[in-house]
Amino acid sequence: MEFLLDLHPDAYPLEGFRRRQLLEWVFVQGVGTFDAMTNLPAEARAELARSYHLNPFREIETVRSADGSVKYLFTLTDGRQMEAVYMPYLDRKTICVSTMVGCPARCAFCATGAMGFGRNLTPGEIVAQVLAVAGGEGIGPREIRNLVFMGMGEAMLNYENTMQAARILLHPQALGMSKRRVTLSTVGIAKGIRQLAAEDDLGIKLAISLHAPDEDTRQRIIPTGAANSIAEIMAAARDYQAVTGRRITLEYTMLRGINDHLWQAELLADVLQGLVSHVNLIPMNPWDGSGFESSTEDQIQAFYDTLEARGVDVSVRRSRGKDAGAACGQLALKRPGAVTGAA
């Protein structure tokens, strides 16, 4: 039996008006069973149910943060587990989705990296996170207008499935998201960055998890070599910008005594010369056994001031969902106060 959400909307079964009805049930109404699609003929519903399924999850658990963020812990039909994070703001609703079970990049300060790599998610398993979160929050799927591929996994190492998921997210008859509100984050896969630049029909935004401006420090905190060298990453970033004209976000997790020295701020400014970019400084979010601490507020401010004085567009990102284990770098299938529900 095929998973319907793995298909591009243009390849959905049924024809013409009936296909549009099917797409509306799935992506606008968020219906999870074919029986509920009452304006489709009974014969069509029966045939769909024989050939396709709509739900890749065996179980869904939630952990709610005091700041309104919600971590969703999904158990897939094969027993594997992964997570997504819902972040409501006054002016928007954002979701952070996973592209893998675990992650092969093994960033030393990231709880997901400590899990190791399980498997790639399919396009439908990525998209289904949005539908499941919308259902869990009692909102329509299209009310979630911002999406970041920043959950578990290195999206560039699951490239084809992630691109298919992005096309489904953007499709006007599916979730209809704006390409300007979808961001893909990578630890620095130069080949993938160049491939993304060539995806003319997408136009989604790019964020690079740099975390250090010098090779010695970067190899210490990203030890597996999943990413390219800083020089290779920045060359690919410049190629990407030359093709797309888009600003690139650089993510920089602040690790006390590791990558927060002022000479590293100066070097980072040098590395970014000529690139239209924005740097997000992210205080490290704690997790058991990490062996790292966040930089102090004073050191983060000094690092910020040094970059700003050099003309770098920079901000400090305050993570949400820390108390639920849902903040950046904390996703590791932990369940403080989880609430379980049937999928």
UniProtKB/Swiss-Prot annotation:
The keyword DNA-binding does not apply. Disulfide bonds join 96-328. InterPro entries: Aldolase_TIM, Methyltransferase_A, RlmN_N, RNA_MTrfase_RlmN, rRNA_lsu_MTrfase_RlmN/Cfr, rSAM. The active site is at 83 (proton acceptor), 328 (s-methylcysteine intermediate). S-adenosyl-L-methionine binds at residues 153-154, 185, 209-211, 285. GO terms for cellular component: cytoplasm. Its EC number is 2.1.1.192. PROSITE patterns: RADICAL_SAM. [4Fe-4S] cluster binds at residues 103, 107, 110. Residues 89-323 form the Radical SAM core domain. It is found in: Cytoplasm. Its cofactor is [4Fe-4S] cluster. Its main location: cytoplasm. Keywords: 4Fe-4S, Cytoplasm, Disulfide bond, Iron, Iron-sulfur, Metal-binding, Methyltransferase, rRNA processing, S-adenosyl-L-methionine, Transferase, tRNA processing. Binds 1 [4Fe-4S] cluster. The cluster is coordinated with 3 cysteines and an exchangeable S-adenosyl-L-methionine. It catalyses: adenosine(2503) in 23S rRNA + 2 reduced [2Fe-2S]-[ferredoxin] + 2 S-adenosyl-L-methionine = 2-methyladenosine(2503) in 23S rRNA + 5'-deoxyadenosine + L-methionine + 2 oxidized [2Fe-2S]-[ferredoxin] + S-adenosyl-L-homocysteine; adenosine(37) in tRNA + 2 reduced [2Fe-2S]-[ferredoxin] + 2 S-adenosyl-L-methionine = 2-methyladenosine(37) in tRNA + 5'-deoxyadenosine + L-methionine + 2 oxidized [2Fe-2S]-[ferredoxin] + S-adenosyl-L-homocysteine. GO terms for biological process: rRNA base methylation; tRNA methylation. One of its GO terms (molecular function) is metal ion binding. It comes from the Bacteria. SUPFAM superfamilies: Radical SAM enzymes. Specifically methylates position 2 of adenine 2503 in 23S rRNA and position 2 of adenine 37 in tRNAs. Belongs to the radical SAM superfamily. RlmN family. Reaction proceeds by a ping-pong mechanism involving intermediate methylation of a conserved cysteine residue. This is Probable dual-specificity RNA methyltransferase RlmN. It comes from Deinococcus deserti (strain DSM 17065 / CIP 109153 / LMG 22923 / VCD115). The lineage of its organism: Bacteria, Thermotogati, Deinococcota, Deinococci, Deinococcales. The gene is rlmN.
